[in-house]
């Protein structure tokens, strides 16, 4: 009932020619602006109150992803202030009856609803708000082309195309490149989403494809190659080959090191064996040099004594069939100094016979002993 009363009251005032309240006018409710450029949002007002000292102008911004409007500009009594992210970017009009603002350097995130609100106390009736929808136009960014599925013959695949930026939303078109010709692809294609369904890939469908994203500001394109295997296969093959090469290198290094260690071990063993073989020979030589003279050599030495000894003492040497005549100790026991060197070790006759003698000393024993005794017998038996 009350609402009907107010409606009737406003109608009567209009018919009477009496206009009370603030009237806000928005000439353009939809505004498009290119990214990076400036835009002027026009908002005018009319009031029945002559005094403008308490007049206030407020602009708010409502983004499609926000939950409530945000104040970006406020002016009262001729004092204006820009607020939030629009600070230093908004300039308001100083003309009476004009509440317009100019925003510089518009960005894609500035797209949304702008609300102009004018209030003048005591003038409470009328339309004091107006709205403007602003769209910041952006050329489509370079789209991203991709393959869904395995790009091999007989496998179902689809091609996708998407531009991250673009206002208004771009429309997508697919083309197949055949040499210098560009052939539009129309079947199984959605221009709004940019998805091209190919199905089971055949040799006829292999080739180069191009996707173009278009809006009122321009277009951008991307290309995709269906003539080579899917990149994932190449990555797997590359990883396998790299791993195989790494294993071969490791095996080669281990084999080389083991071979080198083995060679050093053989050389060390060979040197040790040579040293071991030389030690007994050295001991034998030292022992041979330090041994006493054999009995045969002593007999030969007696046989080669000077003749004066035989003449003066004929009984000193006897034949093999006679008893030996004792000789004076000074004449029969010449002192022979042992050679300087290691201590002589006496050895039994059996040990002397078993040890090998040098080649020059191997003479027949009868010849060395009998010949001198035969000659003595001739001398002794006249």
Swiss-Prot record:
One of its GO terms (biological process) is maintenance of gastrointestinal epithelium. Residues 273-285 have a biased composition (Polar residues). The chain crosses the membrane at residues 235-255. Residues 256-382 are cytoplasmic. Pfam families: Ig_3, V-set. Residues 140-227 form the Ig-like C2-type domain. GO terms for cellular component: basolateral plasma membrane. Its main location: membrane. It comes from the Eukaryota. Residues 1-21 form the signal peptide. Glycans are attached at residues 32, 200, 219. Disulfide bonds join 43-116, 161-211. This is V-set and immunoglobulin domain-containing protein 1. It comes from Bos taurus. The lineage of its organism: Eukaryota, Metazoa, Chordata, Craniata, Vertebrata.
């Amino acid at each position: 009932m009350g609402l009907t009363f107010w409606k009737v009251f406003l109608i009567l005032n209009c018919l009477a020619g009496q206009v009370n309240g603030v009237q806000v006018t928005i000439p353009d409710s939809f505004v498009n602006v290119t990214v990076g450029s400036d835009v002027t949002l026009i908002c005018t007002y009319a009031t029945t109150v002559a005094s403008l000292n308490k007049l206030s102008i407020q602009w708010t911004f409502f983004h499609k992803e926000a939950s409530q409007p945000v104040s970006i500009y406020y002016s009262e009594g001729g004092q204006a202030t820009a607020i939030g992210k629009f600070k230093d970017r908004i300039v308001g009009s100083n003309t009476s009856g004009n509440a317009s603002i100019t925003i510089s350097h518009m960005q894609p995130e500035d797209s949304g609803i702008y609300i102009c609100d004018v209030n003048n106390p005591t003038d409470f009736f009328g339309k004091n708000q107006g709205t403007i929808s602003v769209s910041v136009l952006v050329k489509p960014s370079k789209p991203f082309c991709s393959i869904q599925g395995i790009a091999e013959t007989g496998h179902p695949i689809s091609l996708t195309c998407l531009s991250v930026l673009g206002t208004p939303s771009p429309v997508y078109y697919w083309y197949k490149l055949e040499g210098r010709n560009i052939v539009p692809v129309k079947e199984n294609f959605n221009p709004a989403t940019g998805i091209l369904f190919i199905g089971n890939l055949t040799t006829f469908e292999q080739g180069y494809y191009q996707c173009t994203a278009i809006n009122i500001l321009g277009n951008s394109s991307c290309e995709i190659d269906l003539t080579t295997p899917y990149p994932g296969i190449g990555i797997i093959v590359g990883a396998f080959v790299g791993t195989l090469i790494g294993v071969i290198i490791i095996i080669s290094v281990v084999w080389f090191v083991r071979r080198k260690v083995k060679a050093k071990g053989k050389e060390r063993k060979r040197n040790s064996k040579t040293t071991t073989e030389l030690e007994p020979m050295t001991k034998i030589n030292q022992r041979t040099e330090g041994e006493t003279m054999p009995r045969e050599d002593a007999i030969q030495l007696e046989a080669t004594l000077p003749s004066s000894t035989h003449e003066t003492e004929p009984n000193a040497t006897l034949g093999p069939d006679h008893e030996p005549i004792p000789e004076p100790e000074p004449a029969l026991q010449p002192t022979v100094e042992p050679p300087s060197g290691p201590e002589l070790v006496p050895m039994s006759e059996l040990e002397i016979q078993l040890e090998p003698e040098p080649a020059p000393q191997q003479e027949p024993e009868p010849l060395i002993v009998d010949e001198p005794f035969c000659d003595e017998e001739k001398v002794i038996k006249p």
